[in-house]
Amino acid sequence: MAGHSKFKNIQHRKGAQDKKRAKVFTKLIREIVTAVKTGSSNIPENNPRLRNALTAARSQNLPKERIDKAINSADDANTENYTEIRYEGYAPNGIAIIVEALTDNKNRTAAEVRSGFTKYGGSLGETGSVNYLFKHCGVIQYPTNIASNEDIFEAAIEAGGDDIVSDEIFHTIYTDIENFSKVLEFLTGKYGIPEDSYIGWIPLNTIIIDDKEKAEKLLKLVEILEESDDVQRVFGNYELSDDVYEIIQGEE
């Protein structure tokens, strides 16, 4: 997977999310509820998706009482049922975008996503129009100070990980989707709760954005998509150049 060592770009997006913690919590709670409903169990040991959702929630410091409330509410017949939907399209300059959503109203979500693409010069395509440019896999991230490159590499391979990339910010472990829960559980037992963990779409190759105006327009598109409570994650096959990244960071 080319270009996947440059996780400073993802850190930029995470920083934007941190400013909207209430929305982050809403997305986490929605995933917990969906995990219980689709997994037919509110017991983490019997429900891999719920285990993964709880790890993600704890990494974002979602309070325990809200986690417990979400798990219990999933058994309530009045609790909304959420549908998983994937949207695909292009941002300006040929950047492929994948949007994953959990929604109780498909029409509302589709309208919000389409509006976001249109507002910033993108175009929403059919499902399957860009996913061939990505690998669907598990991603687990730890800060680099958690362990040496060698130690975490050995642990990841022992756990069943496929690949690991270490840079100045993260150790990033990639897994097959089938092995994700097993690897996450192993590494959590060894190193604690990761900085982030999810099943997502990682670009096979990335397009370097070396123009500040183009980068700002792209990041605004990603941000407006992420602002929707229905949208869980946004993925793109882009990477900011070092110079552009430093300029944008300096303006925030």
UniProtKB/Swiss-Prot annotation:
Record InterPro entries: Integrase-like_N, TACO1_YebC-like_2nd/3rd_dom, TACO1_YebC_N, Transcrip_reg_TACO1-like, Transcrip_reg_TACO1-like_dom3, YebC-like
Keyword Transcription regulation: yes
GO molecular function ontology, one term from the record: DNA binding
Keywords: Cytoplasm, DNA-binding, Transcription, Transcription regulation
Keyword Cytoplasm: yes
Gene Ontology CC terms: cytoplasm
Compartments where found: Cytoplasm
Region Disordered, residue ranges: 1-21
Pfam families: TACO1_YebC_N, Transcrip_reg
Example GO biological process: regulation of DNA-templated transcription
PANTHER family: PTHR12532:SF11, TRANSLATIONAL ACTIVATOR OF CYTOCHROME C OXIDASE 1 (PTHR12532)
Family affiliation: Belongs to the TACO1 family.
Record-given protein name: Probable transcriptional regulatory protein RF_0799
Species of the source: Rickettsia felis (strain ATCC VR-1525 / URRWXCal2)
